[in-house]
């Protein structure tokens, strides 16, 4: 996701530079345009280097490390949820629905 946002910002910068280059010749002063182009190049280099510093080197190499399953949710909470589900599945359906409250007809319930 971070890589996608950095690519979008890079494309926007390149698009703005390209759009500025299309300005009519009479609106651009040669000396001023050289200064602006130098400043723009420096700005673009700073932005690109900042974006590349934020990106991990493994992403640049094309290696995306898999996220371990345990990092998403601790084992205790998964076991606890499974135990609650097993207890509720042993009850009849009417008893399982008892703690839930219907707020509106045919919409959502809160358990």
Swiss-Prot record:
Keywords: Cleavage on pair of basic residues, Disulfide bond, Hormone, Secreted, Signal. It is found in: Secreted. Residues 20-87 form a propeptide. GO terms for molecular function: G protein-coupled receptor binding; neuropeptide hormone activity. Its main location: secreted. One of its GO terms (cellular component) is extracellular space. GO terms for biological process: adenylate cyclase-inhibiting G protein-coupled receptor signaling pathway; regulation of cell migration. Coiled coil: none annotated. It comes from the Eukaryota. Disulfide bonds join 100-111. Residues 1-19 form the signal peptide. Somatostatin inhibits the release of somatotropin. Belongs to the somatostatin family. This is Somatostatin-1B. It comes from Carassius auratus. The lineage of its organism: Eukaryota, Metazoa, Chordata, Craniata, Vertebrata.
